[in-house]
Amino acid sequence: MKKSKIICVLACFFAVTFLLFSCGETEKIAPVDIADLSLSELEGYVAVAKYKDVSIALGEKSKEEAISDYLTANSKLNKLPEDAVEYYGAQLKEEYKYHAKQSGRDYDELLHELGLDEEALLKEARTLVYKDIIFAIIQKKESICITDEEKKNFFDRYVTKYAELYGYSEEYVRANLVDEVYQTMLYDKTMEYLIINNDVK
């Protein structure tokens, strides 16, 4: 898998959420769910930029990319929860190990081919935590959530989407990644809200 594709896939999903992947040696690290933090706790970490009634230049980007980049560039980072950074970093490592195994390569070999190292993974983890906090604040302020009906009606569609996005089988996703599927639904619903409430062109 090419570097640009991996980074794009990881970044677009982790702007929202959440937990990434729970497997292997990362079970030693307690899972961290940013959504469990209170609004006041979240706002202690990040001061979110204005996210409604804003004109956002589209350029060559998709609306989703333009909005995500705007929020990332214009929000103010105060600090990050280090337990979340550690957890996300461990999950990223597991993700690359998975792709290395699937392609019959060594983990270190894959990182070298992609021009990455452990420091780069940690930097990416910090970016993902930052983005997740931004989206979690918006979700809490605007009461954006996924209803039981939405989970039921859209589950199959999102299982397919998640499997295609991350290269898993649908059977594996259904058995092991249900929470991640729901988080993808939440991300899409949040992004739809942001697209509707801003002028992106």
Predicted segments with their positions:
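C-terminal motif of bacterial Sec signal peptides marking the signal peptidase cleavage site
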Residues: 19-22
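Peptidyl-prolyl cis-trans isomerase
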Residues: 24-114, 126-201
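Sec-dependent N-terminal signal peptides
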Residues: 5-16
